[in-house]
């Protein structure tokens, strides 16, 4: 087992004895974008995360990282054991659903994929499954917008119900590069799905590009005067998972949000966390998301103490206001 980084003191419990959010690193940072041609294998990534002191990893389900359909009962048990041997837990799973956009494929096809994902996650002791709409921002072309929206709601309701049986949450990561990327659309959808184990994956970079720049929203973008901070306050009650990274409003390949090292962008993290408030404090995990960042190998090392400080100072502020 690799030695864990021990150079920084850690707060692991609050005064009332409850745990604080643990910090994970997303594995897609080493397989997408600048790493796509020479992706790190998953074992190398896990060793890096452990060596640098992360509490856990968030699994990118895109090959060559663990794809749920590639595993048997024996091999999934071995994968879980190898991750645990490094002292790491798993914060969530982001499956590869590119061929099954939920508003466009037959519902049975999407639900079949979700059954495989649920089986994999149950074996891996993963309680959070990340999804998106897959469809481009312009919306589905094969069917009317209203019909597509109704199908999306039905499919995610049924998916959430299936995951609930195993104690799992389904979280939607809204972002500029996919359909339903306006603040009002995001709020409406999560309320229309209306399942207790369905919620939002709030990514600080996507929130910034969406609220402050109206990225890929089309004509008459829906901007929020308070940017990502106002967006956080608007969605706080629906947030079930959190990705933190900086943003300057730019897009990767004119598609979706660039993810910049902390301090290289415009996000006011203390204000954003304060706007999220109690829901953020009660999350089990905060995940560092370096998707598409060419300097990840260096900057993900530097990010961990920054995020720890943000977390600990945020919890101190919450405690000082009487919130536990």
Regions found by a protein language model. Give the residues of each.
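N-terminal pre-domain/capping segments
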Residues: 1-126, 195, 199, 274, ...
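Active-site acidic/histidine proton-transfer and metal-coordination neighborhood
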Residues: 6-12, 82-86, 101-202, 298
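Short beta-strand segments at enzyme active-site cores
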Residues: 57-60, 90-95, 127-134, 170-173, ...
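A short, acidic, flexible beta-alpha connecting loop/helix-capping segment that sits on the rim
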Residues: 285-306
């Amino acid at each position: 087992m690799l030695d864990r980084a021990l150079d920084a003191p850690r707060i692991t419990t609050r005064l009332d004895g409850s745990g604080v959010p643990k910090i994970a690193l997303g594995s897609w940072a080493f397989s997408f974008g600048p790493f796509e041609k020479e992706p790190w294998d998953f074992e190398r990534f896990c060793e890096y995360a452990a060596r640098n002191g992360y509490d856990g990893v968030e699994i990118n389900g895109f090959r060559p990282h663990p794809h749920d359909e590639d595993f048997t009962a024996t091999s999934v048990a071995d994968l879980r054991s190898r991750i645990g041997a490094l002292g790491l837990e798993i914060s969530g799973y982001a499956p590869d659903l590119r061929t099954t956009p939920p508003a466009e494929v037959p519902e049975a096809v999407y639900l079949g994929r979700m059954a495989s994902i649920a089986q994999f996650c149950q074996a891996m002791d993963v309680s959070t499954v990340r999804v998106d709409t897959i469809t481009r921002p312009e919306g589905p072309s094969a069917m009317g917008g209203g019909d597509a929206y109704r199908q999306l709601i039905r499919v995610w309701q049924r998916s959430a119900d299936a995951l609930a049986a195993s104690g799992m949450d389904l979280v939607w990561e809204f972002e500029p590069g996919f359909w339903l990327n306006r603040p009002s659309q995001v709020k409406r959808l999560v309320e229309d799905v209306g399942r207790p184990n369905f919620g939002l994956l709030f990514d600080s970079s996507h929130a910034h590009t969406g609220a402050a720049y109206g990225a890929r929203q089309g004509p008459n973008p829906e901007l929020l005067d308070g940017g990502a901070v106002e967006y956080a306050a608007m969605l706080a009650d629906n947030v079930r998972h959190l990705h933190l990274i900086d943003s300057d409003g730019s897009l990767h390949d004119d598609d979706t949000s660039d993810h910049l090292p902390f301090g290289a962008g415009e996000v006011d993290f203390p204000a954003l966390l304060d706007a999220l408030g109690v829901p953020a404090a009660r999350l089990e995990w905060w995940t560092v998301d370096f998707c598409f960042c060419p300097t990840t190998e260096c900057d993900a090392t530097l990010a961990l103490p920054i995020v720890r400080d943000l977390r600990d100072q945020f919890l101190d502020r919450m405690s000082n206001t009487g919130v536990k």
